[in-house]
Amino acid sequence: MRELSAQQAAALHAQQAVQLLDVREPWEHELCHIAGDLHIPMGQIPARLADIPQGRPLIVVCHHGMRSYQVAEFLLARGFSDVANLDGGIDAWARAVDPTLARY
């Protein structure tokens, strides 16, 4: 599985070349999120696979990159072919790409 830096992910997101999948809990998503993301908490992923676009590359996002890594592995095992993990999660994005995002 690919690990992308915040800068790499931001460049792809700016080109609208990927779908960001945020797997954090609702309270975390309310604190801060990346515009245009698809929010499905990790615990809901198995029941909501049909809500995740298969024809588009995915970058999975969480707080620091651990939950998103697990979800990315889960998706790859279920036939999603182009899945990457955001290394360092939204915290890395806030530090490197958008310092206006709340950090927690």
Language model: regions and residue ranges:
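Rhodanese-like catalytic fold shared by cysteine-dependent sulfurtransferases
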Residues: 1-19, 26-57, 66-104
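Short, surface-exposed ligand- or partner-binding patches at beta-edge/loop junctions that are enriched
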Residues: 61
